[in-house]
Amino acid sequence: MLSLVYHKSVPRYLLMRAGAKRIKNLETGRFSPLQLEDAPEPELPTPEWIRVKPLLSGICGSDLGTLSSDNSPYFSPITSPPFVMGHEVVGVVTDDNSGFRAGERVVLEPALGCAVRGIDPPCPYCASGRHALCLNVAKGDVSPGIQTGFCRDTGGGWTQRTLVAHPSQLHRVPEDLSDEATVALEPLACAVHAALKTNPGPDDTTLVIGAGNIGLFTVAALRRLTDAGRIICVAKHERQREEALRLGADEIVHPKRTYADLPEMLGTEAMRPELGKPVVTGGAEKVFECVGSAGTIEDALRLTKPGGKVSLVGMPGAKSSLDLTALWHKEVTLSGAYAYGVEEYKGERTSSFDLAMRIAPQVRLETMIGPRFRLEEYREAIAAARSAGREGHVKVVFDHRGIRH
């Protein structure tokens, strides 16, 4: 039984950094840190842990960044290679344990917080339900790892075998929610958290920069869970533009027209400095940056009105130069929106995952899944994920059910 295992080394890291974008298939070739191999089943760290057989596993932008070494070395002390990759997972429980029955379908909440690690009392963040912000991600019953799929002890979703999960990580899936819809719940939960954390009002103009799956899901969450008024989405490809409108955006702008069209749409103007990008005097009240590149982060700051808020939803890459003058001059508030947790929604405290499940039927997540690949086709799968926007895909997945489309 095969798994896709990430083996980190300094030479491989440097090779990927230098050549992954220039040399075709380097990140899945002979010298790649990702290798298809017969990895053993992970052991249960403690008796209450549960074994889960993945059905579908998504390919996330953070996975692609890991393979190409574009991710920041910030995460190096809080991950533990070699690890089986994959944190977007719908699967079935294999044995009766900890209140779960064999055959039950579950979606994984991959954060490895205090409860997962057997740490009691929990840190303040875990105690408040914000497990993704856990202070103890390098301590306890399992090796360092911010999430399943980045920890050597848990396994991950890119496997024909099983992964192991603490019962606190598992959410039962309603029967009427398909595997395809369920595998997208984890990124949708991230978008739910981002939308509610910034929570635009009806008088706000909200700008979403980026229309990959996290940008599209952010549009969906904003429209369904907040009172957001006008939503503008920056989307490059035809499928992305269509999906953004379907999910609730009012207007679409092509990235190449960012400074040509957006200032007028936002009721402001752009002025040309001697060097660099245009200076925008006004802007949107709330901006969600869903790409993670230095260029789009800078765009977000420049396109926010004075006193406005920018939510950094896309995972930033390795360090690069970034002009923060607009943040300083316009007194913009920049905050991160990482993963998920417990949300305050209409007077109730509930998890981001529960809210994601609540809106999933309206979003029609299953229509956004595909193509699907067997694990042995991982080279084609990674290539498809890399070109997803251009090829009209939203979420590329590994299908462990023996079905190929």
Range-by-range predicted roles:
Residues 40-57, 72-127, 174-176:
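Glycine-rich beta-strand-centered segment in the early N-terminal region that forms part
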Residues 17, 275, 298-301, 350-405:
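C-terminal hydrophobic helical "lid"/dimerization subdomain
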Residues 267-277, 281, 320-371, 379-380:
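C-terminal substrate-binding/catalytic core of Rossmann-like NAD(P)-dependent dehydrogenases/reductases
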